[in-house]
């Protein structure tokens, strides 16, 4: 496997950063993909597009995770997204903290601030509709708090969603959060964590 590595000089602006893209496949028709800076710019991008009946019926079920890190009274957002507001496109530019992107069959991001740095790793399990995302604090205050906001969906990977189509039955058991789409109650999207606690939040939509 060839390793590809890029640094900040390769994404001097948000628009430059979405010109290069990556993809990882799971061997049964499912995949993950996004831009080099982690901002989605196409309907078929996300952390897990699952093939419900391999190798067809591809559905986006897990879009991404937005991250904020709090140290003391300071909170930094690493969200990298584009939104429509007041008739124009606005950007959240977490890529300004991104110092390294590596693709070696899996995906590795390195983020740095004046006070801390961390790595984010994304990969898919072979022959299964499973995505693993890992975070590793590599420098700074070990007492910092990571807040992870996962974004879920349930749509055919070339279609678009509207708020009225994003309806789920949700519940939590042990360290697992379950989402059952109203459009297909025969499946369940499961989100598991190795540590931390689940917190209620307002509904958030992303493009």
Predicted region positions:
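Terminal accessory carbohydrate-recognition/targeting modules of carbohydrate-active enzymes
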Residues: 1-207
